[in-house]
């Protein structure tokens, strides 16, 4: 892919150009917190014509798309797939052939147990241009927000990411993948299992069978980086019962090794620590509130989306502007009225210098 038409901004990354963005973008949404998506990934989401998403993609990121963006839900979640992978591949190819800017939003990173390779293969075979935008994998980020480093001097020089799913064509027994567990037995470091909550007892049993000590620390983290995040700690012998008692839900990851006993969380993350806040308002207002709440240590999520709709008063405004010289003051009652007013001025090709004789009155700090 060429670089013609691409601009470089002050922070040193390439921004998307209208001339080159008509292709399919596989974008990693990160571990769950919408603030953890990459800057580049968010820019493409804001511009796309079609977005294909599933449960693992952050729903709050859908609020960033254009109003006319087409949304296609493909419904992947633990134990239930609304669309199977071959169907998703077909949708990607079909949408890519339309010549629009298409985003495939995937949880975590597309190439870390995200089946991104299968989707790329389908696009390659169909001759559809594409680009992969990496995401932050939950295998590292989720333990980190809970104070667990996957590597740490003196306890773990490596980490290993394993799928908790069982595939009959790979695993040799009902207990799990012998290749995976035999490999873990011969390695030092931290083991991170993704998508393994429903098979937690079998995974722990298999680890013991291949030589792991029953008192090896284990942490299970549910809904990491998202509202409702919970962590249960124990060891290989006790963790299954503790998780069952706590009724943890998917998505969840399992961390096994000495580092699972570490807790490097900050003692006080702010006055809103452990407080969940539901946001109501327009996308711009909710984003402003989200940033403020996050800075105080709280967790926020959108519960109601609101939008500003124009009324018949727009026509009355246009008539008034034709006689603007008869007015002395112009009053704005909110930030939204200012945005709409100057948007309409541009639509009507009215020179803002016609307002030079007016005095302005505004209500609220946001209108200043």
Whereabouts are the PLM-identified features?
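Short, conserved phosphate/pyrophosphate- and ester-handling motifs at nucleotide-, phospho-/glycolipid
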Residues: 135, 196, 364
């Amino acid at each position: 892919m060429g670089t013609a038409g691409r601009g470089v901004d002050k922070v040193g990354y390439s921004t998307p150009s209208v001339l080159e963005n008509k292709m399919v973008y596989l974008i990693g949404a990160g571990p769950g917190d919408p603030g953890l998506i990459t800057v580049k990934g968010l820019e493409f989401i804001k511009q796309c014509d079609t977005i294909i998403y599933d449960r693992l993609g952050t729903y709050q990121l859908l609020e960033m798309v254009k109003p006319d963006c087409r949304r296609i839900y493909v419904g992947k979640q633990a134990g239930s797939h609304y669309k199977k992978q071959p169907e998703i591949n077909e949708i990607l190819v079909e949408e890519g052939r339309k010549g629009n800017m298409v985003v495939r939003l995937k949880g975590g990173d597309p190439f870390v147990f995200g089946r991104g390779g299968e989707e790329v293969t389908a696009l390659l075979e169909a001759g559809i241009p594409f680009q992969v935008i990496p995401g932050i994998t939950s295998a590292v980020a989720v333990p980190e927000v809970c104070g667990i480093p996957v590597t740490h001097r003196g306890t773990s020089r490596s980490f290993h990411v394993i799928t908790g799913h069982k595939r009959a064509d790979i695993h040799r027994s009902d207990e799990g993948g012998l290749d995976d567990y035999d490999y873990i037995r011969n390695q030092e470091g931290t083991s991170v299992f993704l998508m393994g909550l429903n098979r937690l007892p079998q995974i722990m049993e298999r680890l013991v069978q291949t030589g792991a000590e029953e008192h090896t620390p284990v942490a299970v983290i549910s809904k990491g980086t998202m509202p409702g995040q919970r962590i249960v700690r124990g060891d290989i012998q006790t963790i299954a019962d503790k998780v069952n008692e706590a009724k943890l839900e998917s998505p969840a990851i399992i961390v096994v090794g000495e580092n699972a006993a570490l807790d490097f969380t900050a003692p006080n993350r702010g006055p809103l620590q452990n407080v969940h806040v539901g946001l109501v308002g327009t996308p711009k207002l909710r984003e402003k509130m989200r940033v403020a709440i996050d800075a105080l240590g709280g967790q926020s999520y959108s519960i109601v989306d609101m939008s500003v709709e124009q009324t018949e008063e727009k026509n009355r405004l246009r008539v008034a502007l034709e006689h603007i010289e008869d007015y002395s003051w112009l009053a704005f009652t909110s930030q939204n009225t200012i945005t709409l007013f100057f948007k309409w001025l541009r639509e009507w090709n009215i020179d803002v210098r016609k307002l030079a004789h007016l005095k302005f009155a505004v209500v609220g700090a946001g209108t200043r």
